[in-house]
């Protein structure tokens, strides 16, 4: 068994040192022995950790790249917009531990993959729906402490504001992975990031952290905001 050193860097998020100088992060396995996307499982003091691959997770990439504000914590209720097949939501569920994570996905085929890979995580609630229409799933999703958005749409920032108005508690947090090329392929990404930030601020957010997630994802920026409403 490999000798590793594990250190908590955020609530339920750990740095893992194999002694090779490479940056790695992990979450404690909520379902020991169960892989979601082929991730490596490692052990320290009889605890199983899942290595979090930043090449397959924008949140993982942001943490590796120096994210300072990580609002997803143990006991915090989360709405995850753009769940895909469940890679990042599975780590978010590990972090939330005893609290619910509502995972919204638009495509039925992808949602089936999500359910197959994440069905043993009992705190992960699959929701089939369109992030542009929060009213359609308002009978399922309760008020949450954090919204995380990874939706490749031109109106990414507007989608976050719309969902915050429905579901985010006052002074709750939101994290959004802004994909510049989904907004406008003709503009400079920095210009797009500034425009999306302006939409978020005017919509009711105070931006408290920004992290570029290259080289893991090109032309992507992670923003963290506190919801002040409007």
Swiss-Prot record:
InterPro entries reported for this sequence: Fibrillarin, Fibrillarin_CS, SAM-dependent_MTases_sf
GO molecular function: histone H2AQ104 methyltransferase activity; RNA binding; rRNA methyltransferase activity
Domain of life assignment: Archaea
Purpose of the protein: Involved in pre-rRNA and tRNA processing. Utilizes the methyl donor S-adenosyl-L-methionine to catalyze the site-specific 2'-hydroxyl methylation of ribose moieties in rRNA and tRNA. Site specificity is provided by a guide RNA that base pairs with the substrate. Methylation occurs at a characteristic distance from the sequence involved in base pairing with the guide RNA.
Similarity field: Belongs to the methyltransferase superfamily. Fibrillarin family.
Keywords of the record: Methyltransferase, RNA-binding, rRNA processing, Transferase, tRNA processing
Binding site for S-adenosyl-L-methionine: 87-88, 105-106, 130-131, 150-153
One BP term from GO: box C/D sno(s)RNA 3'-end processing
Subunit structure, as described in the record: Interacts with nop5. Component of box C/D small ribonucleoprotein (sRNP) particles that contain rpl7ae, FlpA and nop5, plus a guide RNA.
NCBIfam families (alphabetical): PRK04266.1-2, PRK04266.1-3, PRK04266.1-5
Protein name: Fibrillarin-like rRNA/tRNA 2'-O-methyltransferase
EC number(s) on file: 2.1.1.-
SMART domains xref list: Fibrillarin
Pfam families: Fibrillarin
């Amino acid at each position: 068994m490999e000798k590793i050193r594990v250190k908590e860097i955020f609530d339920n998020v750990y740095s893992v040192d194999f002694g090779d100088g490479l940056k790695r992060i992990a979450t404690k396995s909520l379902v020991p022995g169960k892989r979601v996307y082929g991730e490596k499982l490692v052990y320290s003091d009889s605890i199983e950790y899942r290595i979090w691959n930043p090449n397959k997770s924008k949140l993982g990439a942001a943490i590796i790249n120096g994210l300072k504000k990580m609002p997803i914590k143990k006991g915090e209720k989360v709405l995850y917009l753009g769940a895909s097949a469940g890679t990042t939501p599975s780590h978010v569920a590990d972090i939330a531990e005893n609290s619910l994570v509502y995972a919204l996905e638009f495509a039925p085929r992808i949602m089936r993959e999500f359910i197959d890979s994440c069905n043993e995580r009992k705190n992960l609630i699959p929701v089939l729906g369109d992030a542009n229409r929060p009213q359609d799933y308002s009978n399922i999703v309760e008020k949450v402490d954090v919204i995380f958005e990874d939706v490749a749409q031109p109106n990414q920032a507007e989608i976050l504001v719309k969902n915050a108005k429905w579901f985010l508690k006052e002074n709750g947090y939101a994290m959004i992975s802004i994909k510049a090329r989904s907004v406008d392929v003709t503009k400079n990404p920095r210009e797009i990031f500034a425009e999306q930030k302006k939409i978020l601020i005017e919509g009711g957010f105070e931006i408290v952290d920004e992290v570029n997630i290259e080289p893991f994802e090109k032309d992507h920026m992670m923003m963290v905001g506190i919801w002040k409403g409007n």
